[in-house]
């Protein structure tokens, strides 16, 4: 493989665009697909919850399988991960659009079948993009500060998308507090095209620099089950997987209820656009400030300290409901700063877990380690997405009613704030007691790896 240029800002921007490209389809679907199913296709939220639980569970199982395929793919001069991103970006975009076709005139069973097919095929295509993209950062550099930068820049991609979609979505997708079916399809097409373009930039601007082919004999097969056994001993990976799982379940359920909170509790879904505009400020503060606080306190330490603050604030809100949506938006934004460490730094924790894997076994297995982590994220998304739909049904949401009753609104507030507290509190506790890589231990691990690599080179 020809010599590549040194790590630079071009790599960071390329990686940002990669996350933006992934978010353009995945996060748009995460935010609006369940809403589209219930408000446009008029599907019972219980059935939506079951559909998402089944398909996401399959998708979670699919992630390690794709990870194994990626790891078994040899670098033939074009990179180990880039070819996957290039090939599967287009079908991912197409399937995203098909998911928002208005089939409300279909028979109820046909609607369910269409939802199931488009949902699960999209997830397979997206997995073939997301696993290699997530693994890509671990082979772009082995410098700890550059990896932190990549994690920060990756979060910036998602932040850019969320900022735009949270502002534009409520203004474009709804009229008079009711959904406009054709606008969902239009916005999905816009997001899909932008996502495809961004991923093409990623495949050209990001360079793979750490080349570690599997150390096996020619006739030895890739032992998938041995790798799975190895990663179960990776305490760093287990810690970040469990912490993320719990946090995502809580936060995902909250996000799934967000539109209903503004639409049915505050009575104004369009005001979510104000939240989107203010999120630019919160995101910039988190993006700029996280680098310095993580360097000073350590990644694990900062995530725990700041998230605990947000948990306390939301615990107070649980007992003292707010009626002013603008006040809620401001308080929620401040709390976002507290939990932003989970978003901004989590991928740096995963990269550290890959190093921990190499330290323990001598093999990095980036694809499987990353996909194992993503397996738990997918399971969490499956649980949170389905549980959000179940929570709507339990709270008394009426799918055929344009305006919900007051009892539903009251239950919604308690559910929203309570899930936030429980989710992030448990995530912090798991990170504290299971994830072993403090600031000092991370430095020791990286030094040990450097010594081993130098010794191997000397031989």
Give the residues covered by each predicted segment.
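Membrane-embedded alpha-helical bundles of multi-pass transporters/translocases
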Residues: 2-459
């Amino acid at each position: 493989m020809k010599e590549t240029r040194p790590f630079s800002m071009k790599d960071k921007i390329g990686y940002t665009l990669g996350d933006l490209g992934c978010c353009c389809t995945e996060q748009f679907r995460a935010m609006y697909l369940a809403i589209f199913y219930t408000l446009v296709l008029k599907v019972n939220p219980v059935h939506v919850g079951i559909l998402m639980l089944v398909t996401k569970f399959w998708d979670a199982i699919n992630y390690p399988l794709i990870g194994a395929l990626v790891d078994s793919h040899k670098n033939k001069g074009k990179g180990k991960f880039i070819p996957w991103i290039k090939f599967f970006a287009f079908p991912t975009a197409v399937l995203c659009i098909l998911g928002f076709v208005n089939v409300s005139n279909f028979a109820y069973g046909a609607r369910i079948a269409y939802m199931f097919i488009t949902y699960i095929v999209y997830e397979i295509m997206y997995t073939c993009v997301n696993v290699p993209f997530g693994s890509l950062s671990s082979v772009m550099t082995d410098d700890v500060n550059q990896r932190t930068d990549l994690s920060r820049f990756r979060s910036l991609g998602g932040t850019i998308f969320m900022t735009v979609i949270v502002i534009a979505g409520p203004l474009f997708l709804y009229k008079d507090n009711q959904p406009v079916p054709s606008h969902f399809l239009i916005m999905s097409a816009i997001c899909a095209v932008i996502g495809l373009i961004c991923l093409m930039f990623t495949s050209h601007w990001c360079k793979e620099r750490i080349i570690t082919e599997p150390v096996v004999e020619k006739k030895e097969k890739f032992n998938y089950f041995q790798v799975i056994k190895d990663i179960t001993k990776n305490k760093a990976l287990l810690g970040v997987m469990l912490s993320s799982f719990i946090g995502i379940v809580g936060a995902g359920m909250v996000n799934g209820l967000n539109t209903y909170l503004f639409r049915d509790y505050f009575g104004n879904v369009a005001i979510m656009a104000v939240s989107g505009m203010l999120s630019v400020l919160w995101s910039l503060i988190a993006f700029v400030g996280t680098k310095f606080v993580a360097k000073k306190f350590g990644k694990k330490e900062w995530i725990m300290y700041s998230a605990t603050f947000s948990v306390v604030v939301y615990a107070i809100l649980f007992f003292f409901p707010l009626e002013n949506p603008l006040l809620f938006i401001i308080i929620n934004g401040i709390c976002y700063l507290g939990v932003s460490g989970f978003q901004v730094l989590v991928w740096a924790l995963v990269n550290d877990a890959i190093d921990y894997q190499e330290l323990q076994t001598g093999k990095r297995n980036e694809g499987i380690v990353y996909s194992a982590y993503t397996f738990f994220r997918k399971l969490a998304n499956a649980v949170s997405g389905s549980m959000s739909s179940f929570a709507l049904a339990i709270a008394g949401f009426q799918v055929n009613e344009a305006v919900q009753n007051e009892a539903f609104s009251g239950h919604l507030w308690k559910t929203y704030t309570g899930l936030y507290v429980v989710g992030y509190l448990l995530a912090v506790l798991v990170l504290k007691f299971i994830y072993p890589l403090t600031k000092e231990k991370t430095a020791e691990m990286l030094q040990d790896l450097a010594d081993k690599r130098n010794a191997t080179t000397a031989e």
